[in-house]
């Protein structure tokens, strides 16, 4: 087993892992957004699950499109709650990121790592992860949008940029 692990992972295994990560991340960001839209929030609402599962499925098939869709849902949540400036800023930054990040799975996974890692207090590790898996222009754009995401999540209740802990602030 260890000898095979040293040989590395096949392209199929890397692609599968990237798509699973993108599906989980897209679903998580969409859930965060849908939970904060008053008209569709709640686990009993089928629209909540349509948004979450739709973004997760899109993330599994086309990771950058899943990231884009989930961030649109999150921006919509901010706009629906009356936070117009952060909602428009997040929407504009997401659109700008998409022009750089749509060229592969790595930038999408780097962006989605900000939400997943921040949920357990590891936001600084997501910047390292993003820099490791992407080229410099993609890493800069992804880190900028990830920083805006961390700032937005801090405004949801934790008031801490790097330690937004989902267990205490959901």
Where are these regions (language model features)?
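Juxtamembrane/interface motifs at transmembrane-helix termini
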Residues: 86-91, 107-108, 148, 161-164
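Cytoplasmic-side transmembrane-helix entry/capping segments in multi-pass membrane proteins
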Residues: 67-75, 88-89, 105-117, 141-145
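Transmembrane helix interruption/hinge and helix-loop junction motifs
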Residues: 38-44, 60-65, 78-85, 102-104, ...
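Generic multipass alpha-helical transmembrane bundles of integral membrane proteins
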Residues: 117-118, 122-170
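Cytosolic juxtamembrane amphipathic/interface segments immediately preceding
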Residues: 2-17
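Aromatic-anchored segments of alpha-helical transmembrane domains
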Residues: 74-83, 94-98, 115-122, 148-156
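Juxtamembrane/interfacial segments around transmembrane helices
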Residues: 72-81, 99-103, 139-148, 168-169
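Core alpha-helical transmembrane segments of integral membrane proteins
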Residues: 13-81, 90-98
């Amino acid at each position: 087993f260890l000898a095979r692990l040293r040989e590395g992972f096949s392209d199929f295994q890397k692609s599968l892992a990237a798509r699973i990560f993108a599906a989980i991340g897209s679903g998580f960001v969409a859930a965060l957004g849908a939970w904060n839209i008053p008209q569709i929030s709640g686990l009993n609402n089928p629209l909540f699950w349509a948004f979450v599962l739709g973004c997760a499925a899109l993330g599994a098939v086309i990771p950058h499109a899943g990231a884009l869709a989930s961030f649109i849902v999150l921006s919509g949540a901010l706009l629906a709650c009356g936070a117009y400036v952060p909602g428009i800023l997040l929407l504009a930054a997401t659109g700008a990121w998409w022009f750089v990040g749509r060229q592969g799975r790595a930038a999408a996974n780097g962006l989605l790592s900000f939400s997943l890692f921040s949920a357990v207090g590891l936001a600084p590790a997501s910047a390292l992860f993003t820099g490791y898996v992407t080229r410099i222009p993609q890493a800069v754009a992804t880190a900028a949008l990830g920083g805006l995401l961390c700032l937005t999540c801090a405004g949801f209740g934790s008031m801490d940029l790097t330690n937004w802990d989902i267990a205490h602030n959901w």
